[in-house]
Structure formats: C-alpha cells, structure tokens
Amino acid sequence: MEDLVLDNNTKNIYNKRFFISTWGCQMNEEDSEKISGLLKGIGYTRTDIRDEADVVIFNTCCVRENAEQKVYGHLGELKALKRKNPNLILIVTGCMMQQKGMPEKVMEKFPHVDIIAGTYNSYKLPEYIERVKTEGNSIIEIWDKEKGIVEGLPVDRKSDIKAFVTIMYGCNNFCSYCIVPYVRGRERSRDPQNIIDEIKDLVSKGYKEITLLGQNVNSYGKGLEPEINFATLLRMVNKIDGLERIRFMTSHPKDVSDELIKAMAECEKVCEQGHFALQSGSTEILQKMNRKYTREDYLTLVKKLRKAMPNVGISTDIIIGYPGETEKDFEDTLSIVKEIEFDSAFTFIYSKREGTPAAKLEDQVPEDVKHTRFNKLVEAVNEIMARKNKEFEGKTVEVLVEGPSKNDDTKLMGRTRSGKLVNFNGCLDQVGKLVNIKITKANSFSLTGEII
C-alpha cells in the first residue's frame, strides 16, 4: 500500500476555482470525489459553472462509445473558452484516456488540452497542474500498469448522509465485450483495516449509509495476507456502531457464494438489495460473452436470494445486440426478464469496444434490429417495474431521508432498504434519519408517500 504525500510546493493556490464533469459508473464518481478533495486541499474551490473555472476536469468513461462522443463534444466547446482565457487549464482523465492510442488522438484533435492522465495516476493532478503553470507545456502521463493502492486521499463527498467506499480496484474476468480490465487493471484489494477505519471515520461525521464499491466486490480479498473474502468483510462492516445501512456493487453472478447470501441475510445493516448483471438470458450468448454462468445458473441464484431474503430488490444490466445474437437469443433474454421480474434493469445496446475480443467478431447485429429488440425489452422492463411498484401502495416502508427531492424541492426523498426511491412531505431536520413512510401512490420509477 502507498500513502499519498503532497509536494508542499503545490500548496500555494488560492481564490482559484475548478469544475469537474464525470461520466460513467460509481467508481468514476468516487474518483471524482477524490480529485475534488485533492484540489480543495491545495486551495481551489469547486464551481458548478464551467465557464468561470480556472481548471476544467473531464473524468471520462469508455464502456460505451456514446460516453466518448459526449467527451469529444464538450472538448470541442471548450476551444473558444480556452482562446478567451489562455490561462485556463483543461484536464482529461479517467478510463477513456487509459485506452491505447487515445491520449495521442485526443491531443491531436484537441491541442488546447493541457493535461491527460489515466486511471492509475489521477491522484497526481495537483502536481501536474503546478507543472503546467510553471513550465507552460502540456502533459500526457499514462501509466501502463497499477502501482499499488494509494491510501489517505482526501475525499470531497457529494452527500453528508451516504458515501461510496471503494474496497478493491480492477477486474480479472475479461468478459469478451468489456474494456474495463484493460483500463482499470488487475484486481487488487484494500487492506480490510483501512476500509474499516475509513467507514468508522465517516460514521463519526454523521454518515448513515455506506456503499462498498468494486468492479467485482465478490473477488475482494484475493491475494491479501491473511486472505479474506467479501462475506467476511460484510460481517466486519456490519459490526460498526452507528452505521445504519450497507449496500454494495458491482457483484458478478458467478461469484455469489452461499456464504455471501447467508451474510447478506444475517447482517441486519446489509440492505436487502443487490445488483447482479445478467447481460443476456441466452446461455449461448453468455458463453460467447465469457460470463462463466448459464441461464439456469442465474435463475438458481435469484431463487437462493429470494429464499434467504423474500423482500430482496434485484437490479441488473442487460446488453442487446451482442454479435451473433439471434431472435431466439433475444427471446431468451425477454423471457427471463419476465420470469424474474427485476425491480430495475439498466438496458444497453451493444457498443463495439476496440481492443476487446468481441470487437473482432464478424456477425454484428444490424442496427435496426438492435433498436427494435431494445425497445421491446425496455417496454417489458418498464411494465414490470410499474406493476411491482403498484404492489407497494398501502404498505409502510422504512426510508433513509437523503434530502430534497430532485423533481420537487417542496418534498423530501429517500430510499427503502430494497432500493426504491420514495418522495414525501417532511422537514429538513429529518434528513439523515430513518422514518416510516406509508406509500400512497406508485409511479413508474418511484413511490410517493407520507410519514406516519
């Protein structure tokens, strides 16, 4: 493990503002919280107005092509701003930059970019900013591989109630469509005591809910001495006084052990919720994806989860249009969605990622077929979600109050233990508290209720 030591000559920046935009998963969100913490630590303040910032940071994603296109669009927009303010420092970091050849491509197309960093060295951004200011030259700094885990980074968290805590980095699964192992590196786990200490510190500051993060949390502990597994870590976190709720993601279906399900059911602070990415309901497609489980394996997992926790909320990811997907394969996916009845599902059209095995496959599904299947799947998912939400009407649920509703600032919002979003009337002094809500109305993607 490596502790961060900030160079003292970077601590001389005052009255400067930074703007950060984040694409991608919760891991990226937590990375941005750390970047924000680092910059605040050297005197910067954060602004939500991009055009008034002295430093603009794009923390990028490359899981799908659409995310990359958005970054290109924003970089193009900043050309005029850079011309207007030559002292503006523009930074691009994250997964997109870790791809082979991408930094050079971005710098060639957008020469007004000042700093390009990858996923392994974003904690060095304060140093890079200082170098640009003193030397005046652009910086491309991409590390080929991880250099251990950096502990002790300052974190500027978005919420005062809930926090992400990363427990491991990287992925060893190499699903055939996925770029993540190539840009996030091999699996490496944090020391359990460092995780416990971080959570205890958060609880002492008033945090009530922790989400344990990893590309595959089920692989946690491999390679540590003494070896520990994720189920054991869950039980350790569950013992922390003052912590109310524990969630985790992402969890690979093939690695969900009976021991983990038992821990989820027995640990009273672990919420009855899990995100288990199905990706396809066709065993043939799952094999091509290198997912290492079958349709029946996934159905068995769901049965085990629901037997152990009858009220468990199960969410998933589904990819439509993987190379070679036939109409039968799609119907297999549609039928398993209807059989399981997920509480929510994130659905995606397959996006070809250069450098992955799937990108070399020739049997690509026509775009119009992809979209037809996608629309049919989304319709089924939404119908199931609306129907399952309807079942909550008249029931009383426990909700952790998170703050004002995003859609109606006259209301408060929070989530049930199973992950359902609930909006209700209340007072701001209830933020951070657990309250009982009677559900009065079910909406397509949320619930409405009243405090009892």
Swiss-Prot record:
It catalyses: N(6)-dimethylallyladenosine(37) in tRNA + (sulfur carrier)-SH + AH2 + 2 S-adenosyl-L-methionine = 2-methylsulfanyl-N(6)-dimethylallyladenosine(37) in tRNA + (sulfur carrier)-H + 5'-deoxyadenosine + L-methionine + A + S-adenosyl-L-homocysteine + 2 H(+). Its EC number is 2.8.4.3. Residues 16-134 form the MTTase N-terminal domain. This is tRNA-2-methylthio-N(6)-dimethylallyladenosine synthase. Keywords: 4Fe-4S, Cytoplasm, Iron, Iron-sulfur, Metal-binding, S-adenosyl-L-methionine, Transferase, tRNA processing. It is found in: Cytoplasm. Binds 2 [4Fe-4S] clusters. One cluster is coordinated with 3 cysteines and an exchangeable S-adenosyl-L-methionine. Catalyzes the methylthiolation of N6-(dimethylallyl)adenosine (i(6)A), leading to the formation of 2-methylthio-N6-(dimethylallyl)adenosine (ms(2)i(6)A) at position 37 in tRNAs that read codons beginning with uridine. Residues 157-387 form the Radical SAM core domain. It is an enzyme of class 2 (transferase). The gene is miaB. Monomer. Coiled coil: none annotated. It comes from Clostridium novyi (strain NT). Residues 390-452 form the TRAM domain. [4Fe-4S] cluster 2 binds at C171, C175, C178. Gene3D superfamilies: Methylthiotransferase, N-terminal domain (3.40.50.12160), tm_1862 like domain (3.80.30.20). GO terms for molecular function: 4 iron, 4 sulfur cluster binding; metal ion binding; N6-isopentenyladenosine methylthiotransferase activity. Its cofactor is [4Fe-4S] cluster. [4Fe-4S] cluster 1 binds at C25, C61, C95. InterPro entries: Elp3/MiaA/NifB-like_rSAM, Methylthiotransferase, Methylthiotransferase_CS, Methylthiotransferase_N, Methylthiotransferase_N_sf, MiaB_methiolase, rSAM, rSAM_horseshoe. Belongs to the methylthiotransferase family. MiaB subfamily. The keyword Transport does not apply.
